[in-house]
Amino acid sequence: HKKLGRLMWDYVGMARNEQGLKFVYEEIQTLKDLFYNDINIPGTQTFNPELEKAGRLGDFLELGQLMALDALDRNESCGGHFREEYQTEENEAKRNDDDYAYVSAWEYNQDINKSQLHKENLDFKEVKLTSRSYK
């Protein structure tokens, strides 16, 4: 879990880039392969807190990889998610409201590579979309 946490912190944090996201996606896949192929859970067949911890780690591995996939899919900077490739000359976030004005949810299909992105477009009637400057 520490390795996963470090990978997420280093590559899927607030500032990220395509190269790092692709790297972390593959690194998490390697961790998942190790985890699912070499897992050894101590304990008995009664209540086993180690089994519970292993289940949570499996979930965290899947979620971390999905977060990297989602960040790769979003080719813009927006809010607290800064893609280094998408910034203005003043190093401000460069949004792409034409392509990314939606809310989304990923459907997991037992394999991260078969996950399906569902989108619901946002219709701004009362508010006009504008970019903010933090300078």
For each predicted feature, which ranges?
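Glycine- and aromatic-enriched mobile tails/lids
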Residues: 1-135
